[in-house]
Amino acid sequence: MKVAVAGGTGLLGRLVVQALSEMGDQPIVLARSQGVDLTSGAGVAAALVGCDAVVDATNIITVRRRPAVRFFESVTRHLLGGAHGAGVAHVVTVSIVGVDSVDYGYFLGKRRQEQLLATGLVPWTLLRATQFHEFAGEVVARGGLGPIVAVPEMLCQPVAAAEAAGCLARLVHDGPQGVALPIAGPQRLGMADMVRGYLRATGQRRNVVSFRFPGRTGAAMATGGLIPDEPFQLGETTFDAYLSGLAVDAQTAGSVR
């Protein structure tokens, strides 16, 4: 199958491309470097001609509602419009477990993405995933203030990004099914503990300070709103195993220096 991967240069998208290739598919990456601008729509229609399916793994790094909603709305509209015009038979999109219960900026963008997908003209499948293991590093990068890392109170059930990518690739072949079973990892952990583990594994000495978002949003994040409350697909890789890999990489890098 010829499968277009939107966001194919990002963390998840690269893994989706790899998974599709291993399954014998022909993935093509939709990216500015290939003359495709998903936010403006330039080049999207032409890039989708001849494609059997599209995987939407696009992402934006923001915690604010307006840029998140604007990004996911524009990208989703352009992808769905291009896919419909090109006769693409299936669009597979990834979202987040808990997107319905957390009224938080980024989540509102993903919620809008889901709404457009469900009301579009192209047959679709939606996979909701919990936070990826790599999210701990993103929190450190975004919440670091010198020797301190500010971490929101979040109860998570993190999953390996590679396992989510493999699931997306399989869903392409399964055909449109609407909302698929969500995927989550095997451990339930607080985000503060995840960040502390990440800091230890990467050899960083920094203090973790937790805070709670106000209102119902903060309560939902802290008390299980990001955990599946329905049957789900269980990932195999633990967060501890992910940290062990990071520690080995850090030691190897240190020995090379």
Where are the regions a protein language model picked out?
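SDR active-site strand-loop-helix element
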Residues: 6, 30, 57-58, 91-96, ...
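Mid/C-terminal beta-alpha module of Rossmann-like enzyme folds, strongest
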Residues: 10-11, 19, 162-257
